[in-house]
């Protein structure tokens, strides 16, 4: 009787299993090797694999509007055809999205085909690399990227995004005319964390133009313009608040710590912390904070429309070259305040004789 009951139970369970759906809809897992098919079918897939894809010239690998909770995996080598255009080469948007790199993958943007020493200031029209726009509670991790034509990640209109273990290697551009190859440009976004990035480029490692609650931690930045707030001003959104940069090394770069606001503009920069920062072989400025910035070059005359308040520097140490300047602060009258610096030690370069309106709590 017991055996019969047990057999009946097992048969019933088997019938239930057989009758149940497989749990994986045919469209849940999608591997794409061409861009057109990926773009057409993306919205019906929960797990998207971009495998060994060559994206045609002038085409964005458009992964916007994905299913909530979708995962995108880059596998093998992803490449892009050559055309002069604005880009982007890749675009992703959605809620609870995960973008990851499979072991051994590479995303090769072939920037050398566009590099001409002019970046986005002229010459060839160069595509931006990756638009991370309109993302909510999402993550991008473990991507290996090389040779972006100009700026790499544009992060805009985002709420809650973690970028972890991103490698961008544009070092070939040091001698081949790469310019304006910012790694991470952030605007109008909140709750952003960039961690464990390894960046070799020719412009800002991180540039925060507007946004709040932004963390940059345990990153390696080499060859570029440092970790920057700004330039702030002259846009629709001109407020930066609540930024922490920590545990980061900036080497072989023009600048280390940089905060720059646009001459004559309005906005605000507040609650900024740089802590446990190591500088190595900085060519121009170890620490530079200026309220006179223009793309054509600083004016030397600070303006007060974008006050810089609550700047904490703690344990920022390292070296600049003999021709570089250790610290340079140029503030308008009364427009820099509430600064607190401790453990700041920059050596090897020149002392600036042009600092102006340095607030108490800081030194120049």
From Swiss-Prot:
Catalytic activity from the UniProt record: (1,4-alpha-D-galacturonosyl)n+m + H2O = (1,4-alpha-D-galacturonosyl)n + (1,4-alpha-D-galacturonosyl)m
Keyword Repeat: yes
Any one cellular-component term (Gene Ontology): extracellular region
Disulfide bonds: 30-45, 205-221, 331-336, 355-364
Enzyme class, first EC level, given as a word: hydrolase
Alphabetically ordered keywords of this record: Cell wall biogenesis/degradation, Disulfide bond, Glycoprotein, Glycosidase, Hydrolase, Repeat, Secreted, Signal, Zymogen
Signal peptide: 1-21
Active site per database record: 203, 225
E.C. number(s) listed in UniProt: 3.2.1.15
UniProt-annotated location(s): Secreted
Glycosylation sites per record: 276, 340
Residue numbers covered by the propeptide annotation in the UniProt entry: 22-27
GO molecular function terms listed in the Swiss-Prot or TrEMBL record: polygalacturonase activity
Superkingdom of the source species: Eukaryota
This protein's record includes keyword RNA-binding: no
A Pfam family per the record: Glyco_hydro_28
Record-level GO BP terms: cell wall organization; pectin catabolic process
Protein's job: Involved in maceration and soft-rotting of plant tissue. Hydrolyzes the 1,4-alpha glycosidic bonds of de-esterified pectate in the smooth region of the plant cell wall.
Family: Belongs to the glycosyl hydrolase 28 family.
Identification of the protein by name: Polygalacturonase
Gene: PGN1
